Amino acid sequence: MKKSYITFEVALMKPYAVEDLPKNKIIEFFKLHWGSPEMVTSSGIYDCSALDGFAVINEEDKILGLITYLIIDNECEIISLDSMEEGKGIGTSLVQEVENLAIKKNCKIVKLITTNDNLLALKFYQKRGFILSQIILNAVEKARKVKPEIPLIGNDGIPIRDEIELIKVLN
């Protein structure tokens, strides 16, 4: 029964392109959930408010989920994914929207980077066909030199040290 509920929820969600939303709304979202729109990973430094992406919006015009991505050559990299209500299919619908676009753009893979403490993300992506492709040891220490507000301790009291790259090969 729960599975049909999730499927029903996903079917009702229509992700909007972030370019169709007010820029200040996107910036405020990233400030609230990440401290700033700036994302620093081993793959680069990004202004998430300037990236392409999709958002799920509720009836009150509140962002329930937002994903940003970057396409370079035949690779699509998910830079950020946030879902405000877990277990309702928001993250799944956003990832699927990016995968569909990546296929249309002839990308061979979708990839992303998360940190070693983000066990929920590791579970989420692996359940959706992503595989671990690389561990970048001490990458977060380097990122803190650019963005010192990155916390030392993350989810479940786990020290944030390493980045983990996940990939999904597209057919």
Labelled PLM ranges:
Residues 112-121, 137-144:
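Conserved beta-strand-loop-alpha-helix junction that forms the acyl-donor binding cleft
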Residues 80-82, 111-113, 165:
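Short aromatic/hydrophobic contact patches that present stacked aromatics
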Residues 102-114:
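Conserved GNAT acetyl-CoA-binding A-motif
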Residues 37, 41-44, 48, 60, ...:
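Conserved acyl-donor/pantetheine-binding loop and adjacent beta-alpha core of acyl/acetyltransferases
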Residues 1-21, 164, 168-171:
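Conserved N-terminal entry element of GNAT/NAT acetyltransferase domains
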Residues 88-102, 123-127:
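Conserved acetyl-CoA-binding loop-helix of GNAT-fold acetyltransferases
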Residues 17-86, 92-95, 169:
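Acetyl-CoA-dependent GNAT
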